[in-house]
Swiss-Prot record:
InterPro entries documented for this protein: Kynureninase, PyrdxlP-dep_Trfase, PyrdxlP-dep_Trfase_major, PyrdxlP-dep_Trfase_small
GO biological process, one term: L-kynurenine catabolic process
Protein name per UniProt: Kynureninase
Family recorded in the similarity comment: Belongs to the kynureninase family.
Assembly and interaction partners: Homodimer.
A Gene Ontology term for the protein's cellular component: cytoplasm
Catalytic activity: L-kynurenine + H2O = anthranilate + L-alanine + H(+); 3-hydroxy-L-kynurenine + H2O = 3-hydroxyanthranilate + L-alanine + H(+)
Function noted in UniProt: Catalyzes the cleavage of L-kynurenine (L-Kyn) and L-3-hydroxykynurenine (L-3OHKyn) into anthranilic acid (AA) and 3-hydroxyanthranilic acid (3-OHAA), respectively.
Entry cofactors: pyridoxal 5'-phosphate
Gene it is expressed from: kynU
This enzyme's EC code(s): 3.7.1.3
Pathway as given in its UniProt record: Amino-acid degradation; L-kynurenine degradation; L-alanine and anthranilate from L-kynurenine: step 1/1; Cofactor biosynthesis; NAD(+) biosynthesis; quinolinate from L-kynurenine: step 2/3
Residues that, per the record, bind pyridoxal 5'-phosphate: I97, S98, F129, P130, T131, D132, T172, D201, H204, Y226, W256, T282
Record organism: Burkholderia pseudomallei (strain 668)
Keywords: Hydrolase, Pyridine nucleotide biosynthesis, Pyridoxal phosphate
Length: 416
């Protein structure tokens, strides 16, 4: 892709192009931040009005039954399941990634304590998204045994970090900063052969790349719905536990929604035999209902078509940045190899924050991550090839004119 006309031609031939019309995208904005917050499905506003106005406003408490609120976490989990290689009854929409990670990590450590008490080490990556590490650190602090969080600095170091003391490997499939993607089947096999349990974070994978959790024989996973799945800001996350583990994994947040018969109101906790045991308290129905609007769009295509366009978009973006912005201090930190790349492209720049603020001021929305990383997410459901061209041209102009040096672009916002 060497001209804007070529980009427009690619858009005309794009089989996913009609899906863009199902998103409410503001005019004059090129949105390359779907890896942080997905765009709003057009159906979401009407769905919100239905939930608030009719189901809550008129149905009141009856809607737990008549509108299907009570079954929503499991029903939506079943709809999400095909996107991550899961079966019906293995996914629940609930809580946040951090909370679900706490549940699963604690359940896995408890399981190992019963069957292999010597295993007290959690292996993860130093470059993992911080909340994953914070949750592990906090959980270890609560335990009355000598647990350890062991961090590796390179994916190649994982085999050497695994030993007969490893309980769980907690790995994020696609790195939030660089977009590096692990080989899920290979990593899972390595971890399981070492006698450890494999816990995946799919925050930057679900809805972005094909995932096959059951095919890889993973042991558990968490993910969010507000990025590529377009569930809305703060929409509830998801937890996946394969059926072979569901009765054996006992999560610590034993709230009433995880009980086998919540309305029996028994004084002693008896966990649900299935995925519902990973629920805790009453669910956020309004925000959870919005998740279905994003899933409705995914139902009109498949992850392989999404992946093909994702790679084409990121290939084009990287090539254009390196040709149109040649001579600028930009360093690609995202892998070039397709099998190692998620659905984003990240570049390092000495003044990355200021450059990103200048881009946003001109209607090209990406985001910034420390240290010095310009991060661009590509969501094939609504990102066009002409968006790629126009974004790079805007970046080139900002760098050539040094427009990023304007004082207002150096002011740090609370959210970057």
């Amino acid at each position: 892709m060497k001209t804007r006309e070529e980009a427009l031609a690619l858009d005309r031939d794009d089989p996913l192009a009609p899906l863009r019309e199902q998103f409410a995208l503001p005019a004059g904005v090129i949105y390359l931040d779907g890896n942080s917050l997905g765009a709003q499905p057009r159906a979401a506003a009407a769905r919100a009005q239905q939930v608030i106005g009719a189901e809550w406003g008129e149905g009141l408490i009856r809607s737990w039954n008549t509108a299907g609120w009570f079954a929503l976490p499991r029903r939506l989990g079943d709809r999400l399941a095909p996107l991550i290689g899961a079966a019906d009854g293995e996914v629940a929409i609930t809580d946040t990634i951090s909370i679900n990670l706490f549940k699963l990590l604690a359940a896995m450590l408890r399981h190992q304590a019963r069957h292999a008490p010597k295993r007290r080490v959690i292996v993860s990556e130093r470059s993992n998204f911080p909340t994953d590490l914070y949750i592990a650190q906090g959980l270890i602090a609560q335990l009355d045994r000598d647990y350890e969080l062991r961090l590796i600095d390179d994916p190649a170091d994982l085999p050497d970090a695994l030993d007969d003391e490893t309980a769980v490997a907690m790995i994020t499939h696609v790195n939030y900063r660089t977009g590096y993607m692990h080989d899920m089947p290979s990593v899972t096999q390595t971890v399981r052969q070492a006698g450890a349990l494999m816990l995946w974070d799919l925050a930057h994978s679900a809805g972005a790349v094909p995932v096959d959790l059951n095919g890889a024989l993973a042991d558990g996973a968490v993910g969010c719905t507000y990025k590529y799945l377009n569930g809305g800001p703060g929409s509830p996350a998801f937890v996946w536990v394969p059926k072979r583990h569901q009765r054996a994994f006992e999560q610590p947040l034993s709230g009433w929604w995880g009980h086998r018969a919540p309305f029996a109101m028994q004084p002693a906790f008896e966990p649900d035999p299935g995925i519902a045991r990973f629920l805790c308290g009453t669910q956020p129905i309004v925000s959870m209902s919005m998740v279905e609007c994003g899933l409705d769009v995914f139902a009109q295509t498949d992850m392989h078509a999404i992946r093909r366009k994702s790679l084409a978009l990121t290939d084009a973006f990287v090539a254009l940045v390196e040709s149109r912005c040649a001579g600028q201090p930009l360093k690609l930190v995202t892998p070039r190899a397709h099998h190692q790349r998620g659905s984003q492209a990240s570049f390092e720049h000495p003044h990355g924050y200021e450059v990103m603020q200048a881009l946003i001021a001109r209607g090209v929305i990406g985001d910034y991550r420390e240290p010095r990383i310009l991060r661009f997410g590509f969501t094939p459901l609504y990102t066009r090839f002409v968006d790629v061209w126009d974004a790079v041209e805007t970046l080139r102009d900002i760098l050539d004119t040094e427009a990023w040096r304007a004082p207002e672009f150096a002011t740090r916002a609370a959210v970057t």
